[in-house]
Amino acid sequence: MSKQTLILLYGGRSAEREVSVLSAESVMRAIDYTKFFVKTYFISQTGQFIKTQEFSSQPAATERLMTNATIRLEQQIRPSDIYEEGAVVFPVLHGPMGEDGSIQGFLEVLKMPYVGTNILSSSVAMDKITTKRVLESADIPQVAYTVYIEGQDLDRCLAETEAVLSYPVFVKPANMGSSVGISKAESEEELRAAILLALTYDSRILIEQGVLAREIEVGLLGNTDVKSTLPGEVVKNVDFYDYQAKYIDNEITMAIPAAIDESAMTSMRTYAETAFKAIGACGLSRCDFFLGQDGQIYLNELNTMPGFTQWSMYPLLWEHMGLSYAELIEELVRLAQEMFEKREGHLI
């Protein structure tokens, strides 16, 4: 039986490229090589596509993957050269230019099936402010928030925020993930500084009410027939679950399933599936919730390309549901092919 060619894109132009490399390495080691032939391409910070490694069998545990030594500039190609008839692309890319609809549009122009959400749902979910407004229309509970857009009167925004929210608040670039550029503010001075920091990553800034809450996550998988996992909990050993805690200091553990009552579990899964459909998603997503001390549930965000590292919540959630990492990848490829055929059919 001939193998399916799977093309992995990793790296990327965003500040989350290091997470992409970690995710791609984990995917490479989890793939079932009896079913897939794998080609990998690195996207540099300046947007160059560089052909890196190919594997027809399981790489040795000692073999170094996705390292600088595997990236040779003389292997640079035109982006369109990744095209291969019948291949499926797995864009293991996080953040802007990865999960905001950009790479999805490029792959649709190339007429290639790809893992993950489509152009529209990727771009909607990437922008935290737009996501908030879409989820409001679906009657999904969220924490109170205000918005600052670069060029607006900052002092007026500070006054409006203090009138609506109470400290602490969290300040987030609208178009970043992996906690990049996010700050906690407990005073007007800190809020001003946090907004200025966030503006170095994006021109649209979300300011959210801080809540004393547990962080609960639900995995989603499917196209029109989306399925959800039991919720898992991010158990933090730090005050704020930032990029350093997530990916460098490893200051978190996962509790799967989360120790919450059945009613909260059911509500979160229902909200997650509703949110997935509200943004028109397909393939996969991870839905993140806050569970307040009073039992109130708030949907925090939808992540359309969640982390795929060996310690990331998304693959662990599905493993708990009985779907191994290798089986998860196989199902994602199947869903990609299904959506590709549907898209192509709509063009006829």
From Swiss-Prot:
Binds 2 magnesium or manganese ions per subunit. One of its GO terms (biological process) is cell wall organization. The keyword DNA repair does not apply. Keywords: ATP-binding, Cell shape, Cell wall biogenesis/degradation, Cytoplasm, Ligase, Magnesium, Manganese, Metal-binding, Nucleotide-binding, Peptidoglycan synthesis. It is found in: Cytoplasm. Residues 132-334 form the ATP-grasp domain. Pfam families: Dala_Dala_lig_C (PF07478), Dala_Dala_lig_N (PF01820). Its cofactor is Mg(2+); Mn(2+). Cell wall formation. This is D-alanine--D-alanine ligase. It comes from Streptococcus equi subsp. zooepidemicus (strain MGCS10565). The lineage of its organism: Bacteria, Bacillati, Bacillota, Bacilli, Lactobacillales. The gene is ddl.
